[in-house]
């Protein structure tokens, strides 16, 4: 099934812009630049951008509902554009993947990610592709909430900027061809 919607998860507001939890927004921002997308338009509780890739129209979205209520925006986006969950890829941060790693999956559980839990609750299925971007776990017994809501260190920023570039290439393959085709490329760790 063709991908027609890419949703990056994050929190709106300047104070969250460069935080680990906003890596989904960062990927959308890079994809917007790469595709010279038009927008943002305010639709379906989101900032929406419209682009074409390989002759296909694609919607890029950043929910403005805050992470833990992302499902409301995703539900509205699917309704607004009359899409099935399988026609969407959700991009988000993952504590359980080391920094510098990413994983494209066609379906699965939330893995404890509250934004993804919200999406599953609102749309009633786990059957949608997702691109998980590794942010790693805190080195010390730091509070996880504090960790995900803090910015990357300068060393981490160098790594994450490369991962975001790879994520854009990965998503472009998934849109142009298919998520199944893109999985081998996206899940290789030697390309960043």
Swiss-Prot record:
This is Peptidyl-tRNA hydrolase. Belongs to the PTH family. It catalyses: an N-acyl-L-alpha-aminoacyl-tRNA + H2O = an N-acyl-L-amino acid + a tRNA + H(+). It comes from Aquifex aeolicus (strain VF5). Its main location: cytoplasm. Hydrolyzes ribosome-free peptidyl-tRNAs (with 1 or more amino acids incorporated), which drop off the ribosome during protein synthesis, or as a result of ribosome stalling. Catalyzes the release of premature peptidyl moieties from peptidyl-tRNA molecules trapped in stalled 50S ribosomal subunits, and thus maintains levels of free tRNAs and 50S ribosomes. Its EC number is 3.1.1.29. The record marks 93 as: Stabilizes the basic form of H active site to accept a proton. The keyword Cytoplasm applies. Monomer. It is an enzyme of class 3 (hydrolase). The active site is at residue 21. The record marks 11 as: Discriminates between blocked and unblocked aminoacyl-tRNA. Keywords: Cytoplasm, Hydrolase, RNA-binding, tRNA-binding. One of its GO terms (molecular function) is peptidyl-tRNA hydrolase activity. NCBIfam families: pth (TIGR00447). GO terms for cellular component: cytoplasm.
């Amino acid at each position: 099934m063709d991908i027609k919607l890419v949703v990056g998860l994050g929190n709106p507001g300047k104070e969250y812009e460069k935080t680990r939890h906003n890596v989904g927004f960062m990927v959308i921002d890079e994809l917007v630049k790469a595709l010279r997308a038009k927008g943002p338009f305010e639709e379906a509780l989101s900032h929406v951008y419209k682009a074409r890739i390989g002759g296909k129209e694609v919607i890029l979205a950043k929910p403005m509902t805050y992470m833990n209520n992302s499902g409301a925006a995703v539900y509205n986006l699917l309704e607004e554009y009359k899409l099935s969950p399988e026609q969407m890829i959700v991009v988000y941060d993952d504590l359980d993947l080391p920094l510098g790693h990413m994983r494209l999956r066609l379906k699965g559980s939330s893995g404890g990610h509250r934004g993804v839990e919200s999406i599953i609750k609102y749309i009633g299925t786990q059957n949608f592709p997702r691109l998980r971007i590794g942010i790693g776990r805190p080195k010390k017994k730091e509070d996880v909430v504090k960790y995900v809501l803090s910015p990357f260190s300068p060393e981490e920023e160098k790594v994450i900027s490369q991962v975001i570039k790879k994520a854009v290439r990965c998503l472009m393959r998934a849109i142009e061809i298919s998520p199944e085709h893109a999985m081998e490329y996206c899940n290789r760790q030697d390309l960043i």
